[in-house]
Every structure is written in structure tokens, then in C-alpha cells.
Amino acid sequence: MLDTISESRPNGLATLGVVVATFATYLALKALYNLYLHPLRKFPGPKLAAIGPYYEFYYDVMKDGMFLWEMERMHQVYGPIVRVNANEIHIRDPHYYSTVYAGNHRSTDKYHDAVAAFSVPQASLATIHHKVHRLRRSILNPYFSKAAVTRLESAINERIERMCSRLEETMHYGQVVDLDAGFAALTADIVTTYFYGQNFDYLGNEGFKFQVRDAILGLIQFYHFTRFFPWIANTIKKLPIPIMRLIHPGAAYLVSSQEEIKDSIRASLDKGNKADAKSVIVQALEDPTIPPQERTLDRLGDEGTTIIFAGTETTARALSVGMFHILNNKTILKKLREELDTLPGVSSGVYSHVQLECLPYLTGAVQESLRLSHGPAIRLPRVANDKALKYGDYIIPPGTPVSLCTVLVHQDPCIFPDPHRFDPERWVKASKEGVNLDKFIAAFTKGTRQCLGINLAYAEIYLTFAKLIRTFNMEIYDTTVDDLTVHHIRLTGAPKQGTGEVKVKVTEKIL
């Protein structure tokens, strides 16, 4: 028996050696192919990035979302078009943005490797193929059109009033307010009520804290890791909730809360209860014109998960960044109040966003808030399958993932001089001179894959700014520009230290 065991050990080691050698040979051959035979072999860029995902993995996973700044360095060395990994081209040219993020004139897919980490394969946001995406977006577009958002305006204003009453409470008690948490509660209340027909009143929670947001923020921390290893996230998602809770409590809470919402909707539908008739998900589930496979509760639940994230954290951050800069510059605050005072017959501070969109200085403040908060800060590659793209002397083969980074577009000094300065006046001046700066706001991306909730987000930002600016005096508390400066690129931008929340004290109610 001992002889048998001793013989099996060398055999086992030999087998392991063969496996390791085979895998190493595969990696070496793959690297050689990527360097010398790959269709992108002639594009400029560092050889280390071209051999595979290792270079990007080091900067984004090991160094916590720093690959963007390495890409910026690459562009300084190699020019405006760079091969940033084995398969992807990155372009640093804001004028080329609308070519990559194209409209209906071209079929544009998403890149599988870029959306796999989201673990919501049936959501529009994670849908790869152009035709499937167009079908899924056509289902939801009517609910997020400008007309639909206008009909939703009273509900938005009701939640803003609720936030104002909470802010007034903090004023009486001299409490510090985390605006990021407050605005996240506001936007989450609006989007969950509209999409699911259920008002969770996150604004009523102490400190505006709610577990769904904590879960989302926790998942953002792991975005890059799950981007390289999506199978891990998908495996965790399939585990029973008690086991999932041991591994990742935030993910467990998010999944369990979504299941509770689904159960509530099932019960409502089974009873023929029309109380939720205005919710997006119930209307979609009951719409016979939608193909059956596209109106299942699981698929629309995936849509809801992405809408809660996209409709909560990014809009909330734009509001926080904007309020910081407005409060930090008394001249800007004064100009905004004077402009709001020009609106006729508004004594209560309750506005229509159609009115507010006509105010040039406020519009400039809204656009600067979006520009300096960036929205999703990650690369979002697009794939033109049916045609080659041309950039300068380079022909980009069909099927190649191509991206531009929002942060680099928003901080381009040729488009936005002194790009880190919050300057609503630049938009007023551009409008007077007939210059279209709007096309360089990429917070919602562009083209057929543009963010579904763009109209809702703009309405929320306009209405919230107007109400808070006219209702309260506030002072910034223990927050500096460094807290807003993007250093780490996770799913959204993050500062060098901490979480970068904007804190204020409400000192006076003036309306």
C-alpha cells in the first residue's frame, strides 16, 4: 500500500506539472498572438497592456480604480487613440464621442466584458445586442419621456417638500446633514414609488440612511473585481440568502429586498388590486402588446435593480456636488436666487421644471453639477458590428470595443477652460454665442444607449436646486474640494480619502 501511495504522488505531481505547463504555454501563445497577429496589433499603446488584461487588472483591482489615470498617461505618450488592452481601443477626443456613442443610424452593441459584472443580464443596461436592447428600451421609454416626467412632477415636488421638512428639523436641533445621503433618499423615494408603486419613505429614516443604498455602495467597491471575475458575483447571487449574507451582507439585503417587492407585486396582481396601477412595473406586466418573455417579473425586476442604482446614486451625487459649489460661492448663490425671483407668481417655492429650464444661469449650474460629478465614471465601450470606424489615419475593425471616458471628456480644457472650476457662466456665454456645450455632457452617455432616466434626473435636479436655494440658508460643514475631487474610479468616482460626502448645517429658513 505504501508503495502505491508513493507511486501516486509523483504521478499526481507530474499531472499537475503538465497542467501548469500547458496553461503557461497557452498564456504565452495568447500573448504572442495579441502582440503580433491580433487585428489591433498596429494601434499605438504599451506592449504590456496589449498582451492581455493583466496591466488593467493591476491598476483597477490592485490599485483600486487607477487605470483611468494610467490611460491618461498613455494618451500623453501615444496620442489620442490608444490600445488600452488586448481587445479595446480608447479615444481621447470629445468631438468623436457622438461617433462612438451613436444614434439610430448605426447598430451598436455593448461589450460583454464591460457589462458582465452587473449580474442583471435581463436589464436594458446590461443587454449586449442592439436589436434586443431596442425592444427592451421601447417598453420603458414611454414611462420616462418628457411628457411622463411632467405628469410625475407633483410626486417629485411632494418628496422635495418632505426633504425640506426634514432639513427644517435638523435646523432646530443644530444637526449636521449628509447631503449625499439626503439626496439619495430623495431620489430613491421618487424612483421606487414610480417604478414599483411602493413608497418606502427613505427620507423619514434617521440620518437619511437606508440599507439599499448601503448595499449599492458596497457593491460599487467590488465593481472592478467582479468585472474581471463575473462568475463570482453570479455564483453569490444564486446562493440561498442566509449563506449570501455571510459572504456579502449588502448583496444579500439587495436581493432579499427585491424578492420582497416581487412578492408584493405578485400578491397585488393575483388579487386584481389596482392600487399599484400607476407603477411602471405593474403596467408593463399587464401590457398584452409586450412579448411575454419581456414582461416577466424576473426580467422587469432586473430593470428595477438598475433603475434604482442609476436613478439614485448618480443623480444624488450631482445634487451634492452642485450644492457644495453653490454654497461655497456666495456670488453664484446670489445670482441663482435673483434669477429665481424673476419667475412670475411663485411665492411658495414650488416650481415647474419647464419654467426652470428657461433660466440660463440655473441651467448652467445644473450642467456644471453633472459635469463635475461625471455620472458613471467607468469606461462604457461600444461595438460597431456592421462597419469599421475611422479615426484619423486609423481604421478600427468592425466588432472592436471602442470607448471614451466621461471624466476625460468633462475635464478637457479645450472644451471647458479651467475645467475643475464650477462656472455656470460658461454655459450662459456659450448659449449667447451659439456654441453647443450640451453635446459634451456625457453623464448620461449618448446615442441609442443613453440613460433611460435622463429626463427624470434633469427634473429632479432643477426642482431640488430651486426649492432648496430659495428655502434655506446653509453652511458647508467639514467638507472641502478634495472631498469632491475624483481620484479612484470605481463604478462612480471617489476621492483619495474617505467617501467624499458633502455635509452642511441648515442655519435659517428664508421662505
Swiss-Prot record:
It is found in: Membrane. It catalyses: (1R,4R,5S)-acoradiene + 2 reduced [NADPH--hemoprotein reductase] + 2 O2 = 2,6,9-trimethyl-13-oxatetracyclo[6.3.1.1(6,9).0(1,5)]tridecane carbocation + 2 oxidized [NADPH--hemoprotein reductase] + 3 H2O + H(+). One of its GO terms (cellular component) is membrane. InterPro entries: Cyt_P450 (IPR001128), Cyt_P450_E_grp-I (IPR002401), Cyt_P450_sf (IPR036396), Cytochrome_P450_monoxygenase (IPR050121). Heme binds at residue 451. Pathway: Secondary metabolite biosynthesis; terpenoid biosynthesis. It is a single-pass membrane protein. The chain crosses the membrane at residues 13-35. Its cofactor is heme. Belongs to the cytochrome P450 family. This is Cytochrome P450 monooxygenase flvD. It comes from Aspergillus flavus (strain ATCC 200026 / FGSC A1120 / IAM 13836 / NRRL 3357 / JCM 12722 / SRRC 167). The gene is flvD.
